[in-house]
Amino acid sequence: HPFVGVVMFLGFFIQFFRYWKYNLMEKEDVKWLTSVGQILKGEEVGDTGKYNAGQKIMFWLMTVCMLTLLATGFIAWRPYFADMFPIPLIRIALLLHAVSALVLIAGIIVHVYAAIWIKGTIRAMVEGVVTQAWAKAHHPRWYREIMAKKKAKDEAAGRL
């Protein structure tokens, strides 16, 4: 368990530095968050970038949970480190470790459920690609940014 946890954390650590800048909350995210009812009805709300507010919250929730799991796992890791800490601290660490794992697992379940709820999202999660129509409908600002980059690249290459 501890060694697998360290490998899991290292994998997440790499992903964190790859995606953190896309997951900073913006003004437009407030509109998305206050319109969750409409979103659950299938309506698109706001000028969403690469990630919507729900995805950003999930990213930061996973970050906090992974850091908590690492720190509390380190404290409780027998026989290597646990002898460095008093028993009451180890007990608190184990409780926080369990709660953090529970929150992480619940978050993943909600994430998968949301992906199933919104058609086309499973493909995005599994294959890492979406159709242009899907991007335009669900993440319009990101779609415009991608199209602007494509247009600039085409113009630079002499294609129109």
Give residue spans per PLM region:
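Membrane-embedded alpha-helical bundles that constitute the cytochrome b-like, heme-associated redox core
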Residues: 2-160
